[in-house]
């Protein structure tokens, strides 16, 4: 196939596109209109223009980094060691694991809280035993990951279709309620730039699907057998994932922001409730609030699978680096599954409040791995030189540094 020939969508690429979408869209999508829209409408417009290319180029760069190994099919933990040496490889793998693992803990906790809340508030039943409920939910999620890749991708596909449909229908449903108040609120230049700076990380992490990129890249190579074939299909699939993320998520965000006044967005933030709960109260329409737990359930479950892949790679990569010898991968898979089951179950029972802080500490690490590491590799690693000289490299580096500086500022 000539490199200039336009790729057609096939079932394999489309399924992975939906998986990457599912990995990115977690329960945070229900708070995104509040967090992203509080700074006003016009900064949001500029961010919507920036975030699409930012998502595509950054994730494509990370995928090309994984693909650049001289040993085809190597995952990210093996590639960092190959390119940066054993010590740096161990350190990056450790950071990679500890950036993703807290998100997995939050999802184990979040799915328990979501189902428990639905049983109590929507079904009007008594709260089930948390120990049993959390074990069943987490065990089911992890058991899916023990099946082969095709089963996991198929289940993710079933979850993402209704998720996309609900977000789209809600966005359309709100159109008659749009008001023009936010269009006439013009921030000062300083206020505009500050809002842009502080809100970029909100969108970056809402569109982040880097935990699934390594598994996605390895899967693409297994499917297409050659470097050129995998490279083209990676770019094609990633472009599709970034496009549907931009359209469906940002349409939902804009529809919510245009429905509420700036004061109402601030009130929603102060009440610390999801956008759907706030809209249900505003319009006195309980049916909207019914979608909240459903969207949260679909988003957490589909995102869980992508983050599990990343956390598993990190943990198994650490073990293999420490062990330094060949091991039975199937046994290792079951051992890591047991580790995740016990840790996620324990955290879901305790329901600690410190998880959010731990997750926020992982933010700069994820941004470094996603934005800076592949761009650094393009300059320093011979296998990545083929990607040098592109304007997109400068764009990703600058946006990555802006995102990291804003995340670090937010932690201070």
Curated annotation (Swiss-Prot):
Transmembrane segments: 31-51, 91-111, 131-151, 155-175, 186-206, 240-260, 286-306, 338-358, 361-381, 391-411
Entry superkingdom: Bacteria
Bridged cysteine pairs (disulfide): none
InterPro entries referenced in this protein's UniProt entry, alphabetically: Amino_acid_transport_2, Hydroxy_aa_transpt
GO cellular component: plasma membrane
UniProt subcellular location: Cell inner membrane
Pfam families from the UniProt entry: Trp_Tyr_perm (PF03222)
UniProt record similarity statement: Belongs to the amino acid/polyamine transporter 2 family. SdaC/TdcC subfamily.
Topology class, membrane: Multi-pass membrane protein
GO biological-process terms attached to the record: amino acid transport
Reaction(s) the record says it catalyses: L-serine(in) + H(+)(in) = L-serine(out) + H(+)(out)
MF annotations from Gene Ontology: amino acid transmembrane transporter activity; symporter activity; transmembrane transporter activity
Keywords recorded for this protein, A-Z: Amino-acid transport, Cell inner membrane, Cell membrane, Membrane, Symport, Transmembrane, Transmembrane helix, Transport
Protein name: Serine transporter SdaC
Naturally occurring in which organism (per UniProt): Haemophilus influenzae (strain ATCC 51907 / DSM 11121 / KW20 / Rd)
Chief subcellular location: membrane
Keyword match Cell membrane: yes
Function statement: Mediates the import of L-serine into the cell. Is energized by proton cotransport.
């Amino acid at each position: 196939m000539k490199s200039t020939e336009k790729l057609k969508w096939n079932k394999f690429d489309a399924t992975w596109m939906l998986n990457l979408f599912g990995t990115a869209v977690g329960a945070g999508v229900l708070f995104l209109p509040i967090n992203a829209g509080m700074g006003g409408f016009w900064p949001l417009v500029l961010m919507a223009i920036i975030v699409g290319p930012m998502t595509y180029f950054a994730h494509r760069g990370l995928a090309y980094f994984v693909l650049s190994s001289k040993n085809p099919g190597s995952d990210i933990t093996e590639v960092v060691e190959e390119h940066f040496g054993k010590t740096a490889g161990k350190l990056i793998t450790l950071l990679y694991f500890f950036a993703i693992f807290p998100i997995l803990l939050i999802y184990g906790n979040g799915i328990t809280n979501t189902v428990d809340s639905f049983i109590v508030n929507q079904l009007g039943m008594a709260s089930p035993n948390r120990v049993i409920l959390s074990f069943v939910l987490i065990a089911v999620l992890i058991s899916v990951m023990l099946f082969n890749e095709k089963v996991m991708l198929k289940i993710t596909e079933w979850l993402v279709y209704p998720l996309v449909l609900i977000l789209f229908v809600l966005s359309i449903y709100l159109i008659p309620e749009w008001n023009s108040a936010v269009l006439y609120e013009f921030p000062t230049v300083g206020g505009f730039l500050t809002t842009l700076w502080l809100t970029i990380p909100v969108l970056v992490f809402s569109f982040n699907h880097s935990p699934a990129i390594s598994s996605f890249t390895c899967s693409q190579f297994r499917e297409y057998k050659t470097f050129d074939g995998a490279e083209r299909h990676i770019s094609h699939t990633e472009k599709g994932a970034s496009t549907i993320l931009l359209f469906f998520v940002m349409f939902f965000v804009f529809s919510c922001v245009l429905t509420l006044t700036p004061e109402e967005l601030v009130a929603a933030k102060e009440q610390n409730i999801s956008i759907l709960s706030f809209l249900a109260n505003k319009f006195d329409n309980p049916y909207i609030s019914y979608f909240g737990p459903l969207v949260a359930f679909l988003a957490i479950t589909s995102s869980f699978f992508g983050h599990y892949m990343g956390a598993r790679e990190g943990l198994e990569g650490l073990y293999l680096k420490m062990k330094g010898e060949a091991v039975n991968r199937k046994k290792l898979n079951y051992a890591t599954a047991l580790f995740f089951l016990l840790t996620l179950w324990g955290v879901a029972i305790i329901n600690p409040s410190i998880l959010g802080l731990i997750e926020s500490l992982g933010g700069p690490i994820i941004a470094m791995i996603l934005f800076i590491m592949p761009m650094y590799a393009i300059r320093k690693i011979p296998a990545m030189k083929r990607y040098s000289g592109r304007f997109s490299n400068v764009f990703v580096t600058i946006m990555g540094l802006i995102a990291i500086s804003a995340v670090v500022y937010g932690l201070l």
